[in-house]
């Protein structure tokens, strides 16, 4: 059986030759050069992904939602009861949550995965990858052992690769877990080197008079656990959570197949920061869907070097932003594959070149 290190070493580089061919093709389409803006750049990025074989296209679409509880909830960093995690996970199996509705609109399947919900028995209808009944309280102990983090990463990577074998070419990540913006902020603070007060936000409507406590909890977690910012697994194990580990696994798994993965909001940025520490080669496969309204979002995205496509003032999580952005990926593929070419028309535009997919 492959180890985590083995799988990380399989992540292919983006193909610059394929991107150059795509650039020439797009410049020769029936439009002024660059007039479709970031849609053109996105199509070129997709063309460079080996899993798409040089031609931007979308097959099956999947949003993987990682569900877990967090011991740090006990510190009063969230106003929602912890039981909401399990209740909302059940609602996802019925297709009634935000991500389910948006994914259905986009023609994507939602995979609801229990990686650490705090219930006595597994919840029917969920994919069971549960490691434990919630992570440790990061204010007083590590979130999990390194072994637990590595095993979950490996399990999710393998599951993601199986979905790719079955025709999924576009992945989205999502999460569900009360209090999970606290470990996410701890990860962002650790890896970016920014102070907790710069990255800790209100999450799911935390009253502002409780924000100081949340900031203090993040600071205590980092001081106590001393995560190594250069070691993504160490950061996830010490101040993360099972849902964050799971999302990182999806990113690594998709990238190992040479396929794109749409980020969601703040939680996914934190997971991406950790995943990129494990393998910087995954970064070109990460596509930022939207700008989260959570404080610290810009800091995390800036560190990743990513600019989101949408700014809808969203902070639901669940993978809702990833699902919402899937039609943008399809639009980039459509202009690449379906637009006419200047060479076949009577139009001559300064700066345009003849399309050539074979040179």
From Swiss-Prot:
Active site residues of this protein: 318
Domain of life according to the entry: Bacteria
EC number in record: 2.4.2.21
Pathway note: Nucleoside biosynthesis; alpha-ribazole biosynthesis; alpha-ribazole from 5,6-dimethylbenzimidazole: step 1/2
Subunit-level organization: Homodimer.
Similarity comment: Belongs to the CobT family.
HAMAP family the UniProt entry points to: CobT
Record-given protein name: Nicotinate-nucleotide--dimethylbenzimidazole phosphoribosyltransferase
Natural source organism: Escherichia coli (strain SMS-3-5 / SECEC)
Gene: cobT
């Amino acid at each position: 059986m492959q180890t985590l290190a083995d799988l990380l070493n399989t992540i292919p580089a983006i193909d610059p030759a394929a991107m150059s061919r795509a650039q020439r093709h797009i410049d020769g389409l029936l439009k002024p050069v660059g007039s479709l803006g970031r849609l053109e750049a996105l199509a070129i990025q997709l063309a460079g992904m080996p899993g798409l074989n040089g031609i931007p296209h979308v097959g099956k679409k999947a949003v993987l939602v990682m569900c877990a509880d967090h011991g740090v909830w006990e510190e009063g960093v969230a106003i929602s009861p912890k039981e909401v995690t399990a209740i909302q996970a059940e609602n996802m199996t019925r297709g009634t949550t935000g991500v389910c509705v948006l994914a259905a609109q986009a023609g994507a399947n939602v995979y609801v995965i229990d990686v650490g919900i705090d219930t006595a028995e597994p919840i029917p209808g969920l994919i069971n990858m549960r490691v434990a009944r919630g992570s440790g309280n990061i204010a007083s102990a590590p979130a999990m052992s390194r072994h637990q983090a590595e095993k979950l990463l490996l399990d999710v990577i393998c599951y993601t690769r199986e979905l790719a074998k079955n025709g999924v070419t576009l992945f989205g990540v999502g999460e569900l877990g009360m209090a999970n913006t606290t470990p996410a902020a701890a990860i962002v603070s650790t890896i970016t080197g920014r102070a907790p007060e710069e990255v800790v936000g209100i999450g799911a409507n935390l009253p502002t008079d409780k924000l100081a406590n949340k900031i203090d909890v993040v600071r205590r977690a980092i001081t106590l656990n001393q995560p190594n910012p250069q070691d993504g697994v160490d950061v996830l194990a010490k101040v993360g959570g099972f849902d964050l580990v799971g999302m990182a696994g999806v990113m690594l798994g998709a990238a190992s197949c040479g396929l794109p993965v749409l980020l969601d909001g703040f939680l996914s940025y934190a997971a991406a920061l950790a995943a990129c520490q494990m393998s910087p080669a995954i970064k070109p496969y990460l596509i930022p869907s939207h700008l989260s309204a959570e404080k610290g979002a810009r800091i995390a995205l800036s560190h990743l070097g990513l600019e989101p496509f949408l700014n809808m003032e969203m902070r639901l999580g669940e993978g809702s932003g990833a699902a919402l952005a899937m039609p943008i990926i399809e639009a980039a593929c459509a202009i690449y594959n379906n637009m006419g070419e200047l060479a076949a028309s009577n139009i001559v535009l300064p700066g345009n070149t003849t399309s050539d997919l074979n040179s």
